[in-house]
Amino acid sequence: MSPTADFDPKPRRASVAVDVGGVIVGGGAPVVVQSMTNTDTADIDSTVAQVAALHRAGSELVRITVDRDESAAAVPKIRERLLRLGMDVPLIGDFHYVGHKLLADHPDCAAALAKYRINPGNVGFKDKKDKQFAEIIEMAIRYDKPVRVGVNWGSLDQDLLTALMDENARAGSPLSARQVTREAIVQSALLSAALAEEIGLPRNRIILSAKVSQVQDLIAVNSMLAERSNHALHLGLTEAGMGTKGIVASSAAMGFVLQHGIGDTIRVSLTPEPNGDRTREVQVAQEILQVMGFRQFIPVVAACPGCGRTTSTVFQELAQNIQNDIRKNMPVWREKYPGVEALNVAVMGCIVNGPGESKHADIGISLPGTGETPAAPVFIDGKKALTLRGPNIAADFEALVVDYIEKRFGQRTAAE
């Protein structure tokens, strides 16, 4: 039998650390969660509100679109408003086509942003491409800002792709078009990074990303980048889609890559429902990292799926209530109860796995299943502490969870 260590996550790939407005990406630092607004950046009120919501949800970096003069002019005002709210969240400027001009024409914007995102596929075309790319890099050097060279297969450098396709056609054993496209994505990122360094931007100011919309392609291009460079890597499945499909696709793709030690910051690109909550993408990113054991953001609530033994909905409602209460209270608890994000709660529906799972949790309850005695044993720190009975079992257990948090994690604050 193979040692169990063989199945543990691979050691994190060694990468160069990049400081993004005080948040370290790469260099062995915890994998950073980031997100992006979908507001018109020129609408300062809406953008500030959404950045604040994303940051409160746990986004450590927030990207905003900078697509025209009005957007660029709004950036320093957005930054100032956020600071007045007590939110020193690094803002990343997302530039396409005219980034070189916007940064030059709006120096306050260039200074206010914590990082610039450049797309090699549309930074410029033909003879203007390298010149306009260089202008952005020179601005990054002037303002001491990092950049992300963000390649996306939807806007891939067509000159590079054509050259590689022509070269492949002449090969004795040509690759598939999909394989050549992957190679073009990787080369675009690496060639752009090399050019940035040649211009004078140090490696500890460069992050790379290769965005695709298919799971296997994301695994391939990021594995290739990891083999060929030590740049910090940003992971994300672009156009992942809506709802369950987007969550599953992003989780499958990034989970595999992260398990192999690759990735320094992640963004889950979910298409929100009309008027939906943008913070959902932050929650999913956190949950990917937490369920894989890489970071802890929020207490875990383990709950059984239910079966014929659990015809009552009490355990489902209780699990949902506790999860909702945790999310609602975490902004306060995170400050008031250091370490609370490591808490494990179990809400189980019958005697089969209920007691065992509850013992594994910090605090757990095994509710009675169909035909079982109407009593619910509660386990605290692996031992049976008491048994709840009567019509208020759910409310009583919720109170016990809060009491446990106050006693266990509140003591840390007092001791400090």
Swiss-Prot record:
Binding site for [4Fe-4S] cluster: C304, C307, C350, E357
EC numbers: 1.17.7.3
Co-factor(s): [4Fe-4S] cluster
Pathway(s) of this molecule: Isoprenoid biosynthesis; isopentenyl diphosphate biosynthesis via DXP pathway; isopentenyl diphosphate from 1-deoxy-D-xylulose 5-phosphate: step 5/6
Cofactor comment text: Binds 1 [4Fe-4S] cluster.
Taxonomy, superkingdom: Bacteria
A Pfam family per the record: GcpE
rRNA-binding listed as a keyword: no
InterPro entries recorded: Dihydropteroate_synth-like_sf, IspG_bac, IspG_bac-typ, NO2/SO3_Rdtase_4Fe4S_sf
Membrane spanning stretches: none
SUPFAM superfamilies in alphabetical order: Nitrite and sulphite reductase 4Fe-4S domain-like
Keywords associated with the record: 4Fe-4S, Iron, Iron-sulfur, Isoprene biosynthesis, Metal-binding, Oxidoreductase
Coiled-coil annotated spans: none
GO molecular function, one term: iron ion binding
Gene3D superfamilies membership: Dihydropteroate synthase-like, Sulfite Reductase Hemoprotein, domain 1
Record's catalysed reaction(s): (2E)-4-hydroxy-3-methylbut-2-enyl diphosphate + oxidized [flavodoxin] + H2O + 2 H(+) = 2-C-methyl-D-erythritol 2,4-cyclic diphosphate + reduced [flavodoxin]
Family (UniProt): Belongs to the IspG family.
Functional description taken from the UniProt entry: Converts 2C-methyl-D-erythritol 2,4-cyclodiphosphate (ME-2,4cPP) into 1-hydroxy-2-methyl-2-(E)-butenyl 4-diphosphate.
Name this protein carries in UniProt: 4-hydroxy-3-methylbut-2-en-1-yl diphosphate synthase (flavodoxin)
Species the sequence originates in: Rhizobium leguminosarum bv. trifolii (strain WSM2304)
